Regions:
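Short linear regulatory motifs enriched in tryptophan with gly/pro/ser
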Residues: 1-147
Length: 147
């Protein structure tokens, strides 16, 4: 599960949300990024995977227009690799990085197999992530059609 918080407003997927337990929300599919980030300086907190507590601070620092034929959203820059799914949150990821630094660590071999031989925590590829985003967009369309 994930959610966006902008001030007192919570934006989430109502199919995965229990309002009785977690309070009222704005339905994520009823709000566009442009409706939330209306001016430079608007900030939000994005929480991914409630169990692991990945908190991301998002802030609109600039607005620009893009040609209409351009596929959006568009990744223009980034830093470092994404932590592997289900690595145990920030603390689990720190432990994983420590294991990978030490080939003599008892968990090194198993961890290397899990993350893959090409995993590099300092690498970021705009092209690779743009392709992944395209795959995610396709998956999300299929997911929405299933409900």
């Amino acid at each position: 599960m994930d959610q966006f918080e902008i001030g007192d407003t919570v934006i989430a997927d109502s199919r995965l949300w229990d309002e009785d337990e977690m309070g009222p929300i704005t339905e994520v599919k009823d709000v566009s990024v442009g409706e939330v980030f209306t001016k430079v300086g608007i900030a939000a907190v994005y929480e991914y995977d409630f169990g692991d507590g990945w908190m991301h601070h998002l802030e609109l620092v600039d607005r620009s227009t893009h040609p209409t034929q351009e596929v959006l959203p568009l990744i223009i820059s980034g830093e470092n690799a994404c932590p592997p799914e289900d690595c145990g949150g920030i603390h689990g990821y720190k432990e994983l990085l420590e294991v990978l630094k030490n080939p003599k660590h008892p968990e090194y071999g198993e961890t290397k197999v899990w993350v893959g031989s090409t995993f590099n925590p300092t690498k970021f590829s705009v092209n690779s992530h743009t392709k992944e985003l395209g795959t995610l967009n396709k998956y999300m369309k299929e997911y929405e059609e299933g409900f």
